[in-house]
Amino acid sequence: MHIKIQDENFNAESLAVIAILAAEGEPETVSLDPLRGEMRDFCRRVVVNENFRGEAGKLLVVPVADKTVRWAVIAGLGPEDKLTPERVRVAAFSAARAAASRGCSALSLTMPKAGDADRSRAAAEGCALASYRFNKYLARDEKDRFTAIEAVTVFDGCEKALEEGRILGESQCWTRDLANEPGCVINPEVLAAKAQELAAELGLACEIWDEKRIADENMGAYAAVAAGSANPPRFIHLTYEPENAKGHIALVGKGLTFDSGGLDIKPSEFMLTMKGDKSGACAVLGAIRAAALMKLPWKVTAIVAAAENMPGGSAYRPDDILRARNGKTIEVNNTDAEGRLTLADALCYASELKPDMIVDIATLTGACAVALGSTTAGLFTNDDEFGDKVLKASAASGERFWKLPMDDPNLRELVKSPFADLVNSAGRYGGAITAAMFLEAFVGKDIPWVHLDIAAADFAKTPFSYYVKGATGFGMRTLAELIREL
């Protein structure tokens, strides 16, 4: 998507779609800038007749009888004194989607105080997200019915913020594409190849380990999860390192390209959408992509322990005792609690790099989805100050996270095993918390760490807000926003 700024000599008559993001007010006063003359008068009459007040989430599409302008799209922002970047993002998405649904690939956009960087960034994100649809496997005639937004002109916007918003929105679409691919297409080797392609495109350092190297590196927990699959594991390590980096952040993503549950096999209906068990991995790859394209001043490491959890003859078993990279032993009492085993070795490795901070992101527990629903994800941390920075980034991105406690000593006891240092599943109650406590055992001492549990938030079963059905790319923009704000 191409995006540019128009100054005060805004030429509305040269564009097919005029999108106005309007703050709430009386129909007679709702802003219709930059419309002029007869077009403005006509749109005002429609606004008054429809009693359109610019409430958040409301959209009015006006067909315009003009030689070049075909539509005026007015999207409500709600009260200006309560205006947030998320409202701008949603309104811009709605306006751009309305243009695309009418076969228009370009639009102009205006809003109150467009020069505000946060508003410009959010508007560009919304427009970029409006172009998303995972349609590569549809018949050609079905593909051709969808119009993508290719060009956006913003009146009096902030140029740097608009470009950042474009990158963030397009990186989330890239993340969604990767997460939406089925297990028959994306296995660990293919995911590693995708990471290599990304590295080559952006000039990132890239290291890929095969199954022999993984075993040689003493990643016993990770290797055990991969043992039951005909598709071998791949360990992915990407690095973006600008000159004079301000610091170093490590991102660790869960990368199960498909999760059958292993020998503790899932019921068939629970296997649906398990192509999305790699969503954490896709999010960290999308985040390092965004960081590199925005040329952010922080060194970023993206780590993925990619594997497939299958019930083959060589699969790991309940009661097995595994040894992780840091020497800790783990009793397996549920082979479907596999993501934390792959993350354990990945977190050990990330800690050895001595970053200033670590964030892991994973579709980890059904317990988190039960607690918070499918549009809010869980946040856990060993450092409240760092956790608050991630929450601030999530608020700016519009991705909802809620901090859950990790200070209950009784729950911590449940993670212990009489036969090993830890047990990989501590039972049903407080399952999201005990999973986070398990992961904490593999984070280096004194390293600020945040764990993001995006189970259920990674996949939209029905369209809502700026999400279509399928992978959401949830968490990618929060990670990128965190790095941008550090």
Put a short name on every predicted segment:
Residues M1-G255:
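Short amphipathic alpha-helical segment within the helicase RecA-like ATPase core
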Residues N51, A106, A192-L486:
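A generic structural signal for tightly packed, nonpolar segments enriched in small/aliphatic residues
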